[in-house]
From Swiss-Prot:
InterPro entries: Peripla_BP_I (IPR028082), SBP_2_dom (IPR025997)
Signal peptide: 1-26
Presence of the UniProt keyword Transport in the record: yes
Family: Belongs to the bacterial solute-binding protein 2 family.
Organism annotation: Paraburkholderia graminis (strain ATCC 700544 / DSM 17151 / LMG 18924 / NCIMB 13744 / C4D1M)
CDD domains assigned: PBP1_TmRBP-like (cd19967)
Keyword DNA-binding: no
Taxonomic path: Bacteria, Pseudomonadati, Pseudomonadota, Betaproteobacteria, Burkholderiales
GO molecular function terms listed in the Swiss-Prot or TrEMBL record: carbohydrate binding
Keywords on record: Periplasm, Signal, Sugar transport, Transport
Record's function text: Part of an ABC transporter complex involved in D-apiose import. Binds D-apiose, D-ribose and D-ribulose.
Protein name in the entry: D-apiose import binding protein
Annotated binding of D-apiofuranose, by residue: 39, 115-116, 162-164, 168, 218, 243, 263
Length: 312
């Protein structure tokens, strides 16, 4: 009888401990949702957010939506079911993601967006993004200068549903189009993909062998274009990217790529977590919903200081 009572007491204590632990985890859980970590930019922001959240004492779940809005919606459901108290989100489309962020808000979970805005305000608590237009103008000026203000060039743009693709393209053209001897002979999407950019660049070289430059909407496309140019023995073609990845840093040091634009992924991710922490503790971030972080130009002169999307 005494043994039976001991087992009952032990079971009750175990259940109490499990319940308390589960409650504590839910009270301290931050969900971090980004596109695929195959792109080093998204991996860097997820890793940075994860590390900062843990340093502040939070548990985390790190999830990947692969730029699929339906999958993103399911992951938000997962965050809700797990009792997350905040979501750090690099979203899967400026329009398609509105419903997911609204769903999180309806469940009482604040969202803190990084890298990509949504086409709505008042739903997310914060939208912390790189100043893509300002950064693209930096890249555009470097590109024009490298080509001596003249020559046929190609633009590789990102995924159409991503608002950043259009903003960067506009920033580039608002600079480049001021120079009448700069002629764009081809503009194609490579959907942020290195593999796709390689294939696109191979085809473009066949129809436009006189191309002098390639300006890309991100670094993975710049790397794909650079690889295609290298295979074609076209080391004379100037390539400029956008992101600030370690791969492009190394390519700049090898003279394979001329420049890139650093968008500070680590800084935005850190800011998002710290603002989430403050919001959960005080009910306010103390900052406006929409926040822009300026970008920096990376060339051979400062590439050695670049590491994991930050100048060290």
């Amino acid at each position: 009888m005494k043994a039976s009572k001991r087992w009952v007491a032990l079971a009750a204590a175990t259940l109490t401990l499990f319940t308390a632990t589960g409650t504590a985890q839910a009270a301290n859980l931050i969900a971090i949702i980004t596109p695929s970590h195959d792109n080093p930019f998204f991996k860097a922001e997820a890793d940075t957010a994860n590390a900062r959240a843990k340093a502040l004492g939070y548990d985390t779940i790190v999830l990947v939506h692969d730029d699929d809005a339906n999958k993103q919606s399911n992951l938000v459901d997962t965050a809700i079911a797990r009792g997350a108290k905040a979501i750090i989100l690099d979203n899967a489309g400026s329009e398609a993601s509105i419903s997911a962020v609204r769903k999180a808000k309806a469940a009482g979970i604040p969202s803190f967006l990084i890298d990509r805005e949504i086409n709505a305000t008042g739903i997310a608590v914060s939208q912390i993004v790189s100043n893509n237009y300002q950064g693209a103008q930096l890249g555009g000026r470097a590109f024009v200068k490298a080509l001596g203000e003249k020559g046929n060039y190609v633009e590789l743009v990102g995924r159409e549903a991503d608002i950043n693709a259009g903003i960067r393209s506009k920033g580039y053209h608002d600079v480049i189009d001021q120079f009448p001897n700069m002629k764009m002979v081809e503009r194609q999407s490579a959907n942020w993909s290195q593999t796709e950019a390689y294939r696109v660049m191979e085809t473009i070289l066949q129809s436009h062998p006189d191309v002098k430059g390639v300006i890309a909407g991100n670094d993975t496309m710049a790397m794909g274009a650079s690889a295609a140019l290298k295979a074609a023995k076209r080391s004379d073609v100037i390539v400029v990217g956008f992101d600030g990845s370690n791969d492009v840093r190394d390519a700049i040091m090898r003279n394979d790529i001329r420049a890139t634009v650093l968008q500070p992924a680590a800084l935005a991710a850190t800011e998002a977590v710290e603002q989430a922490d403050k919001y959960m503790k005080t009910g306010s971030t103390g900052k406006p919903e929409k926040q822009l972080i300026n970008c920096s130009l990376i060339t051979k002169a400062n590439a050695g200081k670049l590491d994991m999307f930050a100048l060290r």
